[in-house]
């Protein structure tokens, strides 16, 4: 039986408005990166992106905002989008990724049609102060606990290649395993010249070993998803991610960087004799 690959697409419903100082993120207003910046994307455009993603095999669609966490205005905006998408595309699993959130806020999202919430730990508790000083790692962990307690599907992972040590990688993965996420997104840092952070880049072999390590250390996760940085990190060795434990990818564009055309990803999977998942377990 062929391995089935779960496809997900993400939509930046507001962009580049965050006041936090995460050193790896071009969406912070502090770094003045050359990216699109807008407060709210039109719902008609979001619906079109969701329809395109679903028609290309995506079962997950993530609504991403660029602030530290949910406030009333953002919560209402995400809920209004979810209500439209739930009606138009009932088979599409709606995911929210809106930063720190209380249980009450998460329950409101759930009532609007959101099924899952993505909040990454990013790195280890020990290393986090070196990449962000405006909020704590503990706040991130608490939000993940809130997601579980609100009855939403937890999606939580991190980003490799920030200059972290091997011990930090192991520490983060242990913390993630304690939260029992359904899906673990793995991102690989892509340097933007506007950002302060400029560590030595990972090798392809090192990145593949990190996918394998993630699968080994979080054995109960249904999906290990290779997300941001996939094309740039792996190049013509991209197909090797699946043999090393990945069974999910993000298709289409990322938040502030371009991905491959969706059709090219589908062609890659077909060439590897890998089927696209047709249902959410």
Swiss-Prot record:
It is an enzyme of class 2 (transferase). Pathway: Cofactor biosynthesis; biotin biosynthesis; biotin from 7,8-diaminononanoate: step 2/2. Its cofactor is [4Fe-4S] cluster; [2Fe-2S] cluster. InterPro entries: Aldolase_TIM (IPR013785), BATS_dom (IPR010722), Biotin_synth/BioAB (IPR002684), Biotin_synthase (IPR024177), Elp3/MiaA/NifB-like_rSAM (IPR006638), rSAM (IPR007197). Binds 1 [4Fe-4S] cluster. The cluster is coordinated with 3 cysteines and an exchangeable S-adenosyl-L-methionine. Residues 1-230 form the Radical SAM core domain. Belongs to the radical SAM superfamily. Biotin synthase family. Catalyzes the conversion of dethiobiotin (DTB) to biotin by the insertion of a sulfur atom into dethiobiotin via a radical-based mechanism. Keywords: 2Fe-2S, 4Fe-4S, Biotin biosynthesis, Iron, Iron-sulfur, Metal-binding, S-adenosyl-L-methionine, Transferase. Homodimer. The gene is bioB. [4Fe-4S] cluster binds at residues 18, 22, 25. GO terms for biological process: biotin biosynthetic process. [2Fe-2S] cluster binds at residues 62, 97, 223. SMART domains: BATS, Elp3. HAMAP family: BioB. GO terms for molecular function: 2 iron, 2 sulfur cluster binding; 4 iron, 4 sulfur cluster binding; biotin synthase activity; iron ion binding. It catalyses: (4R,5S)-dethiobiotin + (sulfur carrier)-SH + 2 reduced [2Fe-2S]-[ferredoxin] + 2 S-adenosyl-L-methionine = (sulfur carrier)-H + biotin + 2 5'-deoxyadenosine + 2 L-methionine + 2 oxidized [2Fe-2S]-[ferredoxin]. This is Biotin synthase. The keyword Glycoprotein does not apply. Its EC number is 2.8.1.6. It holds the Pfam family Radical_SAM.
